[in-house]
């Protein structure tokens, strides 16, 4: 049974107003796509920039740290939904472009795009 506490937690992280959700492969149990430290640097940068830009929480961008996104090379790897855009080499400079161009402006960053497929076939 879903509790009121869970509903409040979802609201507090911005689920009701989310426009996009970025998952970043980092902090892996067994690092494969990149060194563990490299992934954690990318994660820390992503968290900091989304907060600085007012995009986290009620800002419409959800972020999730993933243990593994199953593309075990060229990492850190990220995926942005609802567009289903998969990105490689997601170090801070690339993440900055993804934040500015994709998360804010809605344009896929083709230079780092591995593959794109919107779920549901739309």
Each model region followed by its residue ranges:
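Short, intrinsically disordered low-complexity segments
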Residues: 56-75, 83
